Amino acid sequence: MRITHTSVHLGISRIIVTTLLVVGGLFGGDASAAHFTVFESGQVRPLALSPDGKLLFAVNTPDNRLEIFRVGNSGLSHRASVPVGLEPVAVAARTNEEVWVVNHLSDSVSVVRVNDEGQGGTVTRTLLVGDEPRDIVFAGHGRRRAFITAAHRGQNAPFNPQLTTPGIGRADVWVFDSDNLGNTLGGTPLNILTFFADTPRALAVTPDGTRVYAAAFHSGNRTTALHEDAVPDGGEAVGGVPGPNTNYAGVPAHETSIILKQEGQEWLDSLGRSWTSKVRFTLPDKDVFAINATANPPAPVTGPGGVFSGVGTILFNMAVNPANGKVYVSNTDARNDLRFEGAGTYAGTSLRGHLHESRITVLGASGVSPRHLNKHIDYSTCCAPTPNPESEKSLAQPTGMAVTSDGSTLYVAAFGSSKLGIYSTAALETDTFVPNSANHIQLTGGGPTGLVLDESRRRIYVLTRFDNAISVINTTTRQEIAHLSMFNPEPRSVVEGRPFLYDARNSSSHGDSSCGSCHIFGDFDSLSWNLGNPDLDVKANPNPIVPNLPEFGDDPTFGQNTSFHPLKGPLSTQSLRGMANHGPMHWRGDRNGGFTAPSAQPNSGAFNESEGFKQFNPAFIDLLGRSAQLPPEQMQKFTDFILQVAYPPNPIRNLDNVLTPAQQAGRDFFVNTTSFFHGACGACHTIDPNGNPGEGPFKGFFGSDGRSSFDVSTFFPRVPHLRNAYQKVGMFGTPVVFGKQPIDPFMGDQIRGFGFNSDGSIPTLFNFGSGFDFDPIQNAVGIPNTPEGHTIKKNMEQFMLAFDTNLAPIVGQQVTLTAGLAAVAGPRINLLVARANAGECELVAKGRFGPHEAGFLYAGGGQFTADRHDVGPVADAHLRAAATSNGGTLTYTCVPPGSGVRIGIDRDLDGALDGDERRAGSNPADPLSRP
């Protein structure tokens, strides 16, 4: 069933209704005509019940709203839809009347007042937190304290993230007193706790509210890449790269780095050889942290039970057993310390069909106990057509969980299987459970991300992300009894293509793996993998190459073999974000359309991103173990979807888009000063926000225009973009010389084993930049070996961490205006207006004036357009005055260009404005329902 809306007559303050009448028909059109920006944010806690169990709250991530449902014995009925921030991923109910929503892209938390038994709601406060917040729980005395996970960075964070400092924790938990949020712009936290891990995700709280658990997201697995300069040349026979060192035809591979895993105090390769003396850091792999929620202020738990290590590689969600206090962590564990894809005929080894394991790890007084959910799989066999008896017993990518009040049963959402799994907690804890499809509940929608138990009604409510809907499950019959669709503004190509990224039942013969196993929610896994295939041939490289400066000759390859050898060595997992308009794919550019047509920008030959992505189809067989490649029509749908996924704004760059002096100095050198054979850094790492202007919202080059270039690497690389450099901070300590920089001493504990470059073996951008130091023989135009040269490299590091991307840093930012916050909110609104005037975002304002909902879109020139045709252009000052009188609230949000009409004034893009539809009794969330 579709969501319906109760008709509400829209009234507005006297200040607004006296303005001029807007011309009708200005925003006519349909949803397919407007650009929808796909961020593919991973939901964490998408559902919550009110404490009295009468209301169900759901995040509508693509529509940037909180949906409110009335819960009854006969099912769910929709009551209200409340605009919040961009990409809401988690919700928690503090009381029956107050709900908090975590907005992943807006770096904010919306405090929503629910009224009229769920018939309406409004944002009364917007809290500003660190970058990419993900989860929220209430704990402490009276559950007054809100705990929120966020990355240790972001423009709203009141600290220096120290991105270039070793040994810094990068997992933050913000804590607010819900009864005393303060009068500052973004709220005043009680504390910001920082833990020694990379970006966090999930939270869990004990039933008594005294202890909160926080988990890292990409927590790692104690693996790293040892730079190829630290590995002897000549292959396994001389102590170098483990063999085979040729392909099946005997063609020697180039030298590469190697992947190591820390076992105790030793760093070992896949042959068990020790490289400990070469590694300049250790990885403690701290994964889950306990917090004393009642301390003043809340503080980490010290001593036993304070930190848990070795929980998993990618940690999704957590749940606490209310009966025994044990913590369950849904996770996947990567096997990237092993090698190769394909059948393994020549090498005798392969990861095909067994690259990850889906697990629930049990934490308790006895320690950390991982439980492989698919222990029935016979990994010695591969590639049977699906479905098959083995694959149907599997559960892939476990995410949200819920435990019954007596602690006896655990329900888990298997995101990659479109099922719920049911486990006896006793059997799970003792590892005596037997995988059985009889303990699965099939879901009509795909991609379940979260669930809540309604034990009094014997129901489970599950959010299914593939179709943006809610399934209702009868726990007695273990059957889905209802499925309610939420309004979804995503284009059909996104909805139809998304499952091919995540659906393990369709992707792998064992039913346990998908592309999304490594490309977590369309991004990366912060690991490197050696996925060469020695059973394959060497292939020619058709990609265009960046030319040299004339004084360095006319051979841009400098005689290097540019071919694609099938033994490529370790390479970092690349994000699937932002691939449109950036040419060939993979670090070498070996996925390209270069043999389909002459190469020319845009979209011809090697620059045809659609054709390039389709070259990944063999990986369904060679890596995931599928019986066959995807049929062409399915691969086309996958391609159409994935090329729309976008990068978020850069969280290091100032919100006004003005670089700091150091960043600007770094950019000036990067763009203008020759430091290598091609010229300046920007000769290869192209920065052109208008590159290929005909590509519309996908235009622009942000560190690469898709060409390859010579860079003194052992293979010939495609020039990589630099939009996500800030995500790779956390590895420090190198055993090799870069330029004139000495080898690092032992650097102690670090949070990441992979850094920069194609294989992740370069710890910092400063190390990378030092590779372009002046050398009279190797690089006579290099960066001077002087204090000034050192400063240049430091400045370039700062610039690259704040690198240009498709969206300006202001996109997603928001603030709520009320009478009590007018003084602090005013300057932030001024900033949002200024950036909208600069064309960096479209500014919308949503809220209430008395009992009436209202929406506005900034039209430029200091004027807003209302969501009613009988309300004329509204001056900025008049709108602010209206919001601060008579108890009004108005939340301003900078939204991506092209989405302002939909988010601000015409939700379904049917040409009938939302306010007009509410007055007429038609549905603003149904393009077929018009006044």
Descriptions of predicted regions:
Residues 71-74, 113-118, 178-181, 292-296, ...:
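Short loop/turn segments that connect beta-strands within beta-propeller blades
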Residues 163-180, 283-293, 348-365:
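Beta-propeller blade signature
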Residues 153, 213-216, 220, 224, ...:
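Periplasmic c-type cytochrome electron-transfer domains
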Residues 149-168, 215-282, 329-357:
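Short, conserved, GDST-rich strand-edge loop motifs in beta-rich repeat architectures
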Residues 34-38, 45, 77-82, 122-127, ...:
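A short beta-strand motif characteristic of beta-propeller blades
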Residues 52-54, 96-97, 143-144, 208-210, ...:
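Short coil/turn segments that connect the beta-strands within blades of beta-propeller domains
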Residues 35-67, 283, 396-401:
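Beta-strand-rich domains and repeat architectures in extracellular enzymes and scaffolds
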